Amino acid sequence: MQEALLPPAHPGRFYSDFGPKPFGSGDQRLSSPNLLTNGGDLFYGCYSPFSPTRVLSPPPPRRAASFSHCSSSSDSVVDDGDGAGAAAATEHRLHLAHLALQYQEMANRFELCLSHLADAADEAAALRQENAELRVANNDLACRIAKFGGRQSSAIALAGDLRRLRLPKEQTVPALPPPPQSPPAALMNPVAVPEKQAVLPKSISIRSTGYQKLNQGGKHRVSKPVNVGSQRVFVGIDGAEGGEHKVGVKKEEPPMGGLEFEVYNQGMFKTELCNKWEETGACPYGDQCQFAHGVAELRPVIRHPRYKTQVCRMVLAGGVCPYGHRCHFRHSITPADRFSFGH
């Protein structure tokens, strides 16, 4: 018995059930045939209605395939973009790290410069302090040198003035007869005062018999200084007697053995040396000062004939005389004075 294969009554329905489904309105000639999921023959799946099973795996839609293809492409693009972004981020982080290192290095250099500046400031302050101390020391030394130089120049000026005045010493010197037909030795060879031992005197004192007066009873008494502006006194060197007369009164010429001076009373104008000028070399009063600024301005003072001829008892006893240079007694003690005071 022969079995004839009959075509199906509705071939379109058969192909619609088992054939490939159209995707849109495209050409279906290029569509691939369906394959069985269980690995069966293609013939039974495509043409035979008597296939062992009716379950067929549906073909994947083209849209899903296209979407998966696009997704894979986009994933690859995203992966490429992520790699480029990661590289850029890494490079940016490296750049920031490099900038941080540079900033730290600059901060370290700044701190080092600040420390050097602080050291330089301390050194400058120390140098300023040392300069100030040296300036004070130099000023002190300059003042001392000026004071010493002023005293030395004053001593030299005093020596020159004493040579010019040719004043005798306060102590009595025995008179020597001058040689015949020759000037006095004191006038030819004046006593030179050593410059190293020369000291500025507080006053120039000249002992004269004109200091005292005779009373009516004929007895000598020490009276007050003559109340006149000035007197001219002759001081004998070779034993000649001295005398005095008022200004404006004629008097005979003094002999060759003495000198004549214009003397003043104690306490008058310019009769005593200025202490301020002697200490510092300058006086704030200037020309208005009542005291002498140097030996050239110092005017002689008339004294008692026994002025400074006896030793002061207070000094001889070892005490301090309150009168100082104004004392009328001698403050220099000799061995003879000590011997006489002990007995």
UniProtKB/Swiss-Prot annotation:
<keyword id="KW-0863">Zinc-finger</keyword>
<dbReference type="InterPro" id="IPR045877">
    <property type="entry name" value="ZFP36-like"/>
</dbReference>
<keyword id="KW-0862">Zinc</keyword>
<keyword id="KW-0238">DNA-binding</keyword>
<protein>
    <recommendedName>
        <fullName>Zinc finger CCCH domain-containing protein 39</fullName>
    </recommendedName>
</protein>
<dbReference type="GO" id="GO:0008270">
    <property type="term" value="F:zinc ion binding"/>
</dbReference>
<keyword id="KW-0479">Metal-binding</keyword>
<dbReference type="GO" id="GO:0003677">
    <property type="term" value="F:DNA binding"/>
</dbReference>
<dbReference type="InterPro" id="IPR036855">
    <property type="entry name" value="Znf_CCCH_sf"/>
</dbReference>
<feature type="coiled-coil region">
    <location>
        <begin position="114"/>
        <end position="147"/>
    </location>
</feature>
<feature type="zinc finger region" description="C3H1-type 2">
    <location>
        <begin position="306"/>
        <end position="334"/>
    </location>
</feature>
<dbReference type="InterPro" id="IPR000571">
    <property type="entry name" value="Znf_CCCH"/>
</dbReference>
<dbReference type="GO" id="GO:0003729">
    <property type="term" value="F:mRNA binding"/>
</dbReference>
<dbReference type="Pfam" id="PF00642">
    <property type="entry name" value="zf-CCCH"/>
</dbReference>
<keyword id="KW-0677">Repeat</keyword>
<feature type="zinc finger region" description="C3H1-type 1">
    <location>
        <begin position="268"/>
        <end position="296"/>
    </location>
</feature>
<keyword id="KW-0175">Coiled coil</keyword>
